[in-house]
Amino acid sequence: MASSLTCAGVIWALLSFLCAATSCVGFFMPYWLLGSQMGKPVSFGTFRRCSYPIRDEARGGTVMLEQCGRYASFQGIPSLEWRICTVVTGIGCGLLLLVALTAIMGCCVTDLISRTIGRVAGGIQFVGGLLIGSGCALYPLGWDSEEVRQTCSNSSDQFDLGSCEIGWAYYCTGAGAAAAMVLCTWMACFAGKKQKHYPY
């Protein structure tokens, strides 16, 4: 099977896919922020949450429902910063996935990725990683929302976790973005083969 990638390009394609998958899994999982409420573990993502209080009509009180789910609407996300983070990080993940899938196709299709296309793809990966990094930087601005404060012993504030801690999904998302910005962007410069010039 013919390829439009150099040996470095094949490594770039695999690394691009790994970085995109890492960032996307981290973005989708609701384990960015970990805490507890009413003795139950609670976790937050940018647009998802695990364990939340509901009104128990039978007992006439509030109980914790231990399951994960999305917020009912975009406006239901606890803070404006988390809404912006969701959009920015989602776009960044989409860009990384687009380049990764194109790079994987370049392993199987001739003349798909030239040196110029490889460099453009690297630039897109840099922008995608930058967007995800911006989303990760915005996330702590939402720690002062009421939902987070209830989970973090009413002691959290912007850039202050209180009794909560950062979860693995936050690190996963950031690490995928950082690797895409540094490694993938650099390797993309050497990914495509030199185009043949055909005489007409």
Curated annotation (Swiss-Prot):
Location(s), subcellular: Membrane
Domain of life: Eukaryota
A Pfam family recorded for this sequence: L_HMGIC_fpl
Glycosylation site residues: 154
GO cellular component, one term: membrane
Record-stated family: Belongs to the LHFP family.
Protein name: LHFPL tetraspan subfamily member 6 protein
Native organism: Danio rerio (Zebrafish)
Gene of this entry: lhfpl6
